[in-house]
Amino acid sequence: MAIVKCKPTSPGRRHLVKVVNNDLHKGKPFAALLESKSKSGGRNNGGRITVRHIGGGHKQHYRIVDFKRNKDGIPAKVERLEYDPNRSANIALVLYSDGERRYILAPKGLVAGDQIISGEDASIKVGNCLPMRNIPVGTTVHAVEMKPAKGAQIARSAGAYSQIVARDGAYVTLRLRSGEMRKIPTECRATIGEVGNAEHMLRQLGKAGATRWRGVRPTVRGVVMNPVDHPHGGGEGKSSGGRHPVSPWGMPTKGYKTRKNKGTDQYIVRRRNKK
C-alpha cells in the first residue's frame, strides 16, 4: 500500500493524494454477495429533503458483509481482498471448507491465502473471531459486538481498533479510539487485530468533483441565503448574520450539546477525550 501524489497537470491533479493498494482484486466482486442499492437523494417517502447535502454519485452495489462471524469451528481461507465503495475499510472474500463464501472486514496484515476461524476455541490470531471472555486483557480487537449475536457495531472503519483493558464478572472494559471506556458483555464477539487500510485518512480528493462522485452535494453558508431559508440570511450587502451561529432550525451550532441520555449510559465508565 502506497501514498501517491500526482503530477500537477491540472489543479485537481495537483491536490490529489490517493492510496494505492496493489493487493486488491481488480476484477468484479462475488455476485452472490451483492445487493442492489437505490439512491434516496436525501428525500423521505414524502419526497421532502430530510438530510441535506446528499444527491447524485456513482451507482453502487451493496456488499453483504458478515458482521456476526457465527460460522463456528469451520476454517476459512482468504481468497482475495477487495475494494468496497460502501465503507472506508477494504473487505476480504473468504472460502469456508464446506464451500460457502462470505465477505468480512479485512484486518491489517491479512493477505490472500491466510487461514481464519471463528468460535469459542479460536486462537488469538489476526482475523479470528471469538467471545471476549476468551480474549486476553490487553489484546487489540475490532468489529466488536455491543449485544451478543447482534453483529459487530464498534471499530469497523479503516484503521479502527479497540483494546480490552479489564475483565470483571460478566463484562469486559473496552477502550475505544475516542478514549471512551465502555463495559461490554463477555459473550459479545470481537475479531483480533485492527481494521486495515489505515492510510485512508491521508488521502485528499483533490477536487470538488471527486466529492460529487461520492454522492455529496455542496454546503451553502447561511449568511448568503435569504431570511426565509436560514436565521442568518438577509441583510444589505455582505452582512454577518447578527446573531450567534445557529443551524437552519435555530439550534446553537458551535459546541452546544445535543446528545440525549440513553439507558446504556450506565455502561460508559469514562467519557471520550475532549477535542
Swiss-Prot record:
SUPFAM superfamilies according to UniProt: Nucleic acid-binding proteins, Translation proteins SH3-like domain
Q: Which residues cross the membrane?
A: none
Which SMART domains does the annotation name? Ribosomal_L2, Ribosomal_L2_C
Origin, by domain of life?
A: Bacteria
Q: Name one GO cellular component term.
A: large ribosomal subunit
Q: Which GO terms describe its biological process?
A: cytoplasmic translation
Please provide an example of a Pfam family that matches this protein in its UniProt record: Ribosomal_L2
Q: Which GO terms describe its molecular function?
A: rRNA binding; structural constituent of ribosome; transferase activity
The record, for PROSITE patterns, names: RIBOSOMAL_L2 (PS00467)
Region named Disordered: 223-275
- Which keywords label this protein? Ribonucleoprotein, Ribosomal protein, RNA-binding, rRNA-binding
Q: Which Gene3D superfamilies match?
A: 2.30.30.30, Nucleic acid-binding proteins, Ribosomal protein L2, domain 3
Q: Tell me where the signal peptide lies.
A: none
Q: What does this protein do?
A: One of the primary rRNA binding proteins. Required for association of the 30S and 50S subunits to form the 70S ribosome, for tRNA binding and peptide bond formation. It has been suggested to have peptidyltransferase activity; this is somewhat controversial. Makes several contacts with the 16S rRNA in the 70S ribosome.
- Similarity remark: Belongs to the universal ribosomal protein uL2 family.
Q: What NCBIfam families is this protein classified in?
A: rplB_bact (TIGR01171)
The UniProt subunit note reads as follows: Part of the 50S ribosomal subunit. Forms a bridge to the 30S subunit in the 70S ribosome.
* Protein name, UniProt field: Large ribosomal subunit protein uL2
